[in-house]
Amino acid sequence: YWLSETPGEVSRGWDAKNRRITVWVCLRDKVFGGKFYYFNTHLDHKGHEARRRGALLNVEMMRKIAGKRTPVFISGDMNAEIGQKTGEYLKAYTAWLESAHDAAPESDDRPSFNGFGKSRARTLDYIYFRRARALRYETLDSEAYGVRYVSDHYPIVCTFVF
């Protein structure tokens, strides 16, 4: 769905510079047979209203699609930083979901945004979840894999159990 007033149509939302989407899938655990939903998003990097309303729309759509009883996960580039004005947009997620970074007993504090080394490193990428348990959260520094920057963001991962 598109992060806009018309999520079912190709569109640009609110004050966004770019068109943005959230993709989702319903998966079934091969071992236990239970289903869960995974959403991935990329909020706008310029529009404050687009970030705020995009986060609210994501929560609204997750509630509608996944419901209250099924485990649900969302990750992505939220273009928001805790402790900054943009961090306020993340409250839309934490009102209904838990932060994987905060909930995992093992968690690092490495920033996810590297800007290819040309700008200040900071955390802009997050994982939120509901009806699961986070075990380990990590930002994968690509230097350990022999390539300094594969993107302007490092991957973030979290191990969960249901």
Predicted regions located by residue number:
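The start of beta-strands in P-loop NTPase/AAA+ ATPase cores
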Residues: 35-37, 72
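Conserved hydrophobic/aromatic beta-strand scaffold that supports enzyme active sites
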Residues: 22-26, 40, 126-127, 155-157
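Conserved catalytic scaffold of divalent metal-dependent phosphoesterases
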Residues: 27, 37-47
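Short, solvent-exposed aromatic-acidic interface loops
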Residues: 1-6, 43-46, 140-148
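Structured beta-strand-rich core segments of catalytic domains in phosphoester-bond hydrolases
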Residues: 1-35, 139
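Active-site beta-loop-alpha substructure in enzyme catalytic cores
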Residues: 43-63
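Active-site flanking residues adjacent to catalytic metal/cofactor-binding acidic residues
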Residues: 41, 76-77
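Metal-dependent phosphoester-hydrolase catalytic domains
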Residues: 49, 63-73, 80-162
